[in-house]
Amino acid sequence: MIVLGWMLFVGLATYMGTFPEAMPPTLKWKERLPGQENKARRRIQALEEELLL
């Protein structure tokens, strides 16, 4: 439990930008979002095409 708590703390601190040298989280998060949206749209379109066929 202690290890999980420590990992959560470090993860949140990194995400909030407390340790910016380790990982710039906001930039990676903003870059990742459009890709996920496009993938979701492609999946929805593929499913709709399968249903129409």
Curated annotation (Swiss-Prot):
**Signal sequence: where?**
none
- Plastid in keyword set: no
Annotated Gene Ontology cellular component terms: mitochondrial outer membrane
- Which GO biological process categories is it annotated with? cell differentiation; sperm mitochondrial sheath assembly; spermatogenesis
- Which ranges make up the Mitochondrial intermembrane topological domains here? 1-6
Give the record's keywords alphabetically: Differentiation, Membrane, Mitochondrion, Mitochondrion outer membrane, Spermatogenesis, Transmembrane, Transmembrane helix
Q: Which residues cross the membrane?
A: 7-23
Which parts of the chain does the record assign to the membrane side Cytoplasmic? 24-53
Protein's UniProt keywords contain Transmembrane: yes
> Any other noteworthy remark?
Isoform Kastor and isoform Polluks are conserved only in mammals.
Report the protein name in the record.
Mitochondrial sheath formation-associated protein
Recorded source organism is: Mus musculus
